[in-house]
Amino acid sequence: MKQSHFFAHLSRLKLINRWPLMRNVRTENVSEHSLQVAMVAHALAAIKNRKFGGQLNAEHIALLAMYHDTSEVLTGDLPTPVKYFNSQIAQEYKAIEKIAQQKLVDMAPDELRDIFAPLIDENAWSEEEQAIVKQADALCAYLKCLEELSAGNNEFKLAKTRLEKTLALRRSQEMDYFMAVFVPSFHLSLDEISQDSPL
């Protein structure tokens, strides 16, 4: 059997730090970010299905979210102000992402490639799946800002404002539900969120 470096590369997502130009109280890596995005994307899809008549496969969306940043194992995490400095840079970075995604897919064994390709290549996702994962991605970045700000790190003040605008652009009923039900707890301390459920 031919050796594959696919998962050896993916395991290095934990070595790539997000928010590289900003001082962080707690450093966040791409691997843990991807897990949180998967959880939130699953929740958004489930909320849409349960509350707002959606017909989404929430488990599949969680899987897509797990793989949504895998190309960064080859490209690194380019800071948002650089990535979107102008439309030309944004377009070129998208092209680089596509090349990295294809390179990752090509690392998978031939007999498994058709399984991993549609998880890594966003072009294989439906518009609705893309929208949910993008909402979850922005929500998780916003939650990171709340955590940093609550720890006294004002470095994330502008990022929070920028992400509030992004969330407004991606707004949906399921996001409104998530923001109302789950997000307020991120402003609280461990003692405050543990009061109602002592062990």
From Swiss-Prot:
EC number(s) stated in the UniProt entry for this protein: 3.1.3.89
Subcellular location as annotated: Cytoplasm
Annotated binding of substrate, by residue: R18, W19, H33, D69, D77, L78, P79, T80, D137
SMART domains: HDc
Keyword Ubl conjugation: no
Keyword field contains Cytoplasm: yes
Cofactor list: a divalent metal cation
Cystine pairs: none
GO cellular component entries: cytoplasm
Highest taxon above the source species: Bacteria
Residues where a divalent metal cation binds: H33, H68, D69, D137
HD domain mapped to chain residues: 30-142
First-listed, main subcellular location of the protein, grouped into a coarse class: cytoplasm
Keywords for the protein's UniProt record, in alphabetical order: Cytoplasm, Hydrolase, Metal-binding, Nucleotide-binding
Molecular function GO labels: 5'-deoxynucleotidase activity; metal ion binding; nucleotide binding
Site residues by UniProt (Appears to be important in orienting the phosphate for catalysis): R18
Reactions the enzyme catalyzes: a 2'-deoxyribonucleoside 5'-phosphate + H2O = a 2'-deoxyribonucleoside + phosphate
Coiled-coil residues: none
Stated role: Catalyzes the strictly specific dephosphorylation of 2'-deoxyribonucleoside 5'-monophosphates.
UniProt family annotation: Belongs to the 5DNU family.
Subunit structure: Homodimer.
HAMAP family, per database record: 5DNU
Name of the molecule in the record: 5'-deoxynucleotidase YfbR
Annotated gene: yfbR
